[in-house]
From Swiss-Prot:
HAMAP family noted in UniProt: Glu_tRNA_synth_type1
Keywords (A to Z) from UniProt: Aminoacyl-tRNA synthetase, ATP-binding, Cytoplasm, Ligase, Nucleotide-binding, Protein biosynthesis
Protein name: Glutamate--tRNA ligase 1
Lineage, highest ranks first: Bacteria, Thermotogati, Thermotogota, Thermotogae, Thermotogales
A biological-process GO annotation: glutamyl-tRNA aminoacylation
Species, as recorded: Thermosipho melanesiensis (strain DSM 12029 / CIP 104789 / BI429)
Amino acid sequence: MVRLRFAPSPTGYLHVGGARTALFNFLYARKMKGSFILRIEDTDLERSQKEYEEGLINALKWLGLEWDEGPDVGGDFGPYRQSERLEIYWKYARKLIEEGKAYEVYAYPEEIEKLREKLLAQGKAPHYTREMLQQFTTPERIKEYEKKGLKPAIYFEMPRKEYVLNDIVKGRVIFKKGTVGDFAIIRSNGVPIYNFACVIDDHLMNITHVLRGDDHLSNTVKQIALYEAFNWETPEFGHVSMILGPDAKKLSKRHGATSVEEFRDRGYLPQAVVNFLALLGWSHPEGKEIMNLNELIDAFSLDRLGKNPAIFDPKKLRWMNAEHFRNLSEDKMLDVSRKYLLKFVTEDEIDSRKDWFIRLLKSIKDRIEELSEIPNLVEFFFLEPDVTVDLSDEVKEVYLRLIEEFEEVEEWNEKNILNSFKAAMKGSKVKGKEFYMKLRIVLTGREEGPELIDVVYLLGKENIIKRLKKHLG
């Protein structure tokens, strides 16, 4: 059975790149009837925060990416927080030391930095060897560390050989001999380095596939070497293309919103965000663009993951969100819009006038790209606009007749509203375009908006007459 994981660090909000990684792992796990695991990589003690972990979990749940095992749901391979697995890492680090594949380094950070600068000054890559690093391991230094209560770092001795990766996305990748030197696996504070911890965890959690961004490709040679050192089977790796901004540069804050939480708060639907992210580096075999999560699972395959960078197009996301909003059932449309309507009315009012609010939303749904636009689009239905429209005497006369016609209407429906329009304009020289355009501005304070018949029907007889009378003095 396939087992895939998403392993974020709780050092910030869920970036769209991380969300896409989670999505691809989720889709393949579900497609193959396997397991999707959430693991929290919180070994960066200074930057990891509980609130970020909660934010990551909430953002993933909002997207609909439910996991089978994780810190909140448990499982057979826990704990699922790296900070709760430190003894496990130490056990395997000691094993490498015993086998002569790793060694202790009693060097201070500034000494490592000086060594790095020296190598660079000599025109060499900053690749360390056991000989270089163990020059600091003297009896005096060991005593000094013990006296200060310090612990040595542990370095893995990188075999000087060529490594070959058959990547799911990139194909055959060759890491030439000497690509990397010896590297730390345990810091002097006892906390494991990323490359070491994730290898131990992926092996012990029986992870079969690792799908991640290609910014991790350089880490892979270190991880393959560790798998070989332990004589463990290596999972299948797939490195998906980077996400770039519209200017073809790495996606960052300067391009606008980049976290899932930002898009959620701006009124994007989770199914739209998921749909959009899926198409950043993957394509449907028939070129289909609008899909829900189940359709994505059915269509997903690893062979359609692209090698080229994906462009994050905010306009495409807005269009996709609009499409998903229009495809919602009436009840669901009201449900997702509710929090934006509460700016003007109470929950009870929405529930008691459900049909009215559904018609209101249907009247504006073709204008909505972000749900956060709803308050501005519906404001005039609840708050009378402060507007002055220059009306000719002829138009005023027609509007006075319109008031009289409306006052006679007993059943407020589209047919009677349209008949009132016709009756008011009968015999007048006022053109229909002027009549309707200025009526819209008088009633809404705007030149554009929902169909005028919807505006008049939804505002209701009393409001329409009140606004017309106020404007006509």
